[in-house]
From Swiss-Prot:
UniProt family annotation: Belongs to the IPP transferase family.
GO process annotations (BP): tRNA modification
Catalytic activity entry: adenosine(37) in tRNA + dimethylallyl diphosphate = N(6)-dimethylallyladenosine(37) in tRNA + diphosphate
Binding-site residues for ATP, renumbered to this chain: 12-19
Broad EC category: transferase
PANTHER family named among the record's database cross-references: TRNA DIMETHYLALLYLTRANSFERASE
Listed SUPFAM superfamilies: P-loop containing nucleoside triphosphate hydrolases
The protein's name in its UniProt record: tRNA dimethylallyltransferase
Positions of the UniProt region annotated as Interaction with substrate tRNA: 37-40, 161-165, 244-249
Native species: Janthinobacterium sp. (strain Marseille)
EC code(s) of this entry: 2.5.1.75
Co-factor(s): Mg(2+)
GN (gene name): miaA
Assembly, per entry: Monomer.
Length: 314
């Protein structure tokens, strides 16, 4: 019986140092990085996504970064197919595939499969966008709670993208997403997955990191200039998944005159903290993960130890 190749996932909330840790690991072990980030797939979106720098991208091969125009969407199933294909190609080159990112739905889709869920429907999404514009997402969340209470319970009333997707699935299939996920067959991965989670021992330090990073994005108008350029294209709008990314929505609304620069900063930091909280909630549901303190001075060393243990076990 052939031994499955090892694939390492380095997960964590935003600002937990995933990119730096992965690059440090790749300095010690021949590896390639597969991005697990629903924002990094987009071109023309570098500042607000905290995209790795040109120097970092040159340090080690990266995949699934800058593969889409902001007008396009990228589903969990597309990610799953791409990640499995890339992991096989990287393993065949004799390197270790590192799945690195914070889009927990991608990690879940990769591990568990989402075969039972339908593909996105652009026309239906436009209808849901129009309804949300009329009544607001808290009301859309209440609508979802009546149709799929299990899914609604784990979503915040302002989690527009996931609320829209859950309502879309109900409209397309006549069944709640929670029921479809429960029915979905478990699909075995063609590799052994080592799940590593970078989690903070002190959330206040993570919150400080988040604020510092958002301030750096705003410095000199960098993020606002990026969003101005996106707006100037004329074909993008806040209903698109790309423009719903944290930082972009708030900057767009600021440029619309919805609030002051100080409020943009406050809202951007608050939204990023909410994202980190959701990411940590997802991580806690993954019982098989190996937890490493992202605030530890040698987090990458701890990751390398886990990899060595897994390789020796194979």
């Amino acid at each position: 019986m052939s031994v499955k190749p090892l694939v390492v996932s380095i997960m964590g909330p935003t600002a937990s140092g995933k990119t730096a840790a992965a690059l440090a690991v790749a300095e010690k072990i021949p590896a390639e990085i597969i991005s697990v980030d629903s924002a990094l797939v987009y071109r023309e979106m570098d500042i607000g996504t905290a995209k790795p720098s040109a120097e970092e991208l040159a340090q080690v091969p990266h995949h699934l970064i800058d593969i889409l125009d902001p007008l396009d969407s990228y589903s969990v199933m597309q990610f799953r197919q791409d990640a499995i294909r890339l992991a096989a190609e990287i393993s065949a080159r004799g390197k270790l595939p590192l799945l690195v990112g914070g889009t927990m739905l991608y990690f879940k889709g990769l591990k568990d499969g989402l075969d039972a869920l339908p593909q996105a429907d652009a026309a239906l999404r436009a209808e849901l966008d129009a309804e949300a514009a009329a009544i607001g997402y808290p009301a859309m969340h209440a609508k979802l709670a009546a149709l799929d209470p299990i899914t609604a319970e784990r979503l915040k009333p302002n989690d527009s993208q996931r609320i829209q997707r859950a309502l879309e699935i109900i409209a397309l299939t006549g069944q709640p997403m929670s029921a479809l996920l429960a029915q979905a067959p478990k699909t075995e991965l063609p590799f052994t997955l080592l799940p590593i989670a970078l989690e903070p021992s002190d959330r206040s330090v993570l919150h400080t990191r988040i604020a510092t990073r958002f301030d750096a994005m705003l410095k000199g108008g960098a993020l606002l200039d990026e969003v101005k350029a996106l707006r100037a294209r004329g074909d993008l709008h806040l209903g698109l998944p790309s423009m719903r990314c944290v930082g972009y929505r708030q900057s767009w609304e600021y440029l619309d005159g919805a609030y002051s620069l100080a409020e943009l900063r406050e809202r951007g930091i608050a939204a990023t903290r909410q994202l980190a909280k959701r990411q940590l909630t997802w991580l806690r549901s993954m019982d098989d993960r190996h937890i490493i303190d992202c605030l530890a001075p040698d987090a990458s060393g701890a990751i390398l130890q886990q990899i060595e243990i897994a390789q020796n076990r194979a």
